[in-house]
Amino acid sequence: MVPAMEKATGLKFDMFHLETKGKYGRAGSELFAYCLVKDKAAGITNLEDPKSLFKKAKDAIYKAYHKKGERWTAGEEAFLKTGLDAAGIPADEFAKNRKNADVQALADSWKASYDVGKIQGIPAYVVNGKYLIMTKSIRSVNGMVELIGELAKK
């Protein structure tokens, strides 16, 4: 859906991770931020690209949690292993780089979205940093694209 909205509106959509969600929230933010930093270095800007490390990690964690009922009772290392294995990132590489400045700056930048998440829940869409779309009122992808286009012009 995001690539279709980007194409139709000419806007760039950025995904944020909310570290307040889930037991391993900060670890998740650092994992996703590291994947995004590596994607950017590889020239991958489309987060739906099958080569995107972010997509691979995100999809693996989503599937494990929502489809398989995984709650990672074995701890943070097991949680991280799910995303790292899917993205093909060695655990020692991640451990060495998870606290680097680029990763921390990106993960910290997502904290501004917490208040939006409290209002809308997830996923939440904010247009140009000003307009929060209440997704419960959206009836179709085309309706969402049209609304985003209108809000972007304001």
Regions found by a protein language model. Name each.
Residues 1-74:
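Structural alpha/beta surface segment adjacent to cysteine/selenocysteine redox centers
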Residues 21-28, 50-54, 72-77, 87, ...:
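Solvent-exposed, acidic/flexible segments
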Residues 67-84, 126:
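Charged/polar, low-hydrophobicity segments characteristic of intrinsically disordered regions
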Residues 81-154:
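C-terminal cap of thioredoxin/glutaredoxin-like
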